[in-house]
């Protein structure tokens, strides 16, 4: 796609890039094949890339920017990036520039200071577009590229608004395939490596499960979710499916994760993982987002529902939680406040617990229990001998 005239670099008489370079006596830019006259950048879409080899975030971001640049070149975009070095010396400058496929201004501390002041650079890496409607440094072009890759081009406020609207459409639009697939992938994967078409999942309640193996709360919650998943697989005949959205640090951790899970996953190498984290604004893990049978977002806080109510919270709607609370209150109202059971020496009080193990039948329990806090002793209400119950 051709870039419109509004995005072409402009060279007013003073105060712009061209004037600053001329004031320093610089008549050329650098490339790996030699010097490039300044006239070469006329008519091109220009971005200044402020970076340094000593900066870890710069070293992490530069490969991502190279990938974006090469993609845009292959698309025929007239983008030119110019490297402005924050390196400490000439040797470091050339070492850093060596990996870059674009141009650079000559290493010059006086020039660096002028460009830094002109464009308000307070941190690196920074990418500064030089055209109308550009996103400012404060508005974070780097973050936009990390979120959207080459789709962020041409780095304008209008494009940023368009991308946000696309995210909103995917989150609210009620189309599971549009949310989870793209033109190169229409499936999710199982732990045995098999592929499951996303179209086959339409009509089910889908849990998008965000997390990573290195995270202890994630591993703890996974065991709860596995129990819920297996219970619902039996009682609701496959109407619930979970899809892992991995935030693991590498594919090895992802594979370890998958061996402990009975459900599906977005492939680790697929960018959709990052897209979904952004679309649902996932900042903390684990997180569980529910997409209903109508393909619309039901809740972004299903983790709390599962932790509190287990499989009884299915299908994870607010109305179901209201119903559950009313049901549990009714159950509690029908039970005595205290009991004296011959299996334990102390009086037992009615209590609400997320989960416990009954000290008589040794089976797990949820919600109502008769407990002795002094002895950490719990009984299912059904394991209490009713004839000894003392109504209070």
From Swiss-Prot:
Belongs to the nucleoredoxin family. Its EC number is 1.8.1.8. It comes from Arabidopsis thaliana. Gene3D superfamilies: Glutaredoxin. It is an enzyme of class 1 (oxidoreductase). InterPro entries: C1-like_sf (IPR046349), DC1 (IPR004146), Nucleoredoxin-like (IPR052259), Thioredoxin-like_fold (IPR012336), Thioredoxin-like_sf (IPR036249), Thioredoxin_domain (IPR013766), TryX_NRX_thioredoxin_dom (IPR045870). PROSITE patterns: THIOREDOXIN_2. Disulfide bonds: none annotated. Residues 17-171, 177-326 form the Thioredoxin domain. PANTHER family: NUCLEOREDOXIN 3-RELATED, THIOREDOXIN. This is Probable nucleoredoxin 3. It comes from the Eukaryota. GO terms for molecular function: thioredoxin-disulfide reductase (NADPH) activity. Pfam families: C1_2, Thioredoxin_8. CDD domains: TryX_like_TryX_NRX. Keywords: NAD, Oxidoreductase, Repeat. It catalyses: [protein]-dithiol + NAD(+) = [protein]-disulfide + NADH + H(+); [protein]-dithiol + NADP(+) = [protein]-disulfide + NADPH + H(+). The keyword Oxidoreductase applies.
